[in-house]
Amino acid sequence: MNNTIRELLKKHAGLPVSVDGLDDGADLYAAGLSSFASVQLMLALEENFDIEFPDSLLNRKSFQSIEAIARTVASIVDDRKVA
């Protein structure tokens, strides 16, 4: 999943640094992720993983790092399986 997230970051985040050079725990906002880019990334994640982000997860913490995004996506997928 992290590799997919990296590819989506490359396409949609417009970071001024190389996504490949970022650790999974690196702060994406410190690396240059804007609020606009985070929305574009969210839309790409929703399309790619066939999910919908609930309002409760639309916050900076959910998109802080590749690890955080992976946890957030996994929790949405897990919740969908339970429902």
Place the predicted regions along the sequence by residue.
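Phosphopantetheine-dependent thiolation modules in NRPS/PKS and related acyl-activating systems
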Residues: 1-33, 37-42, 47-83
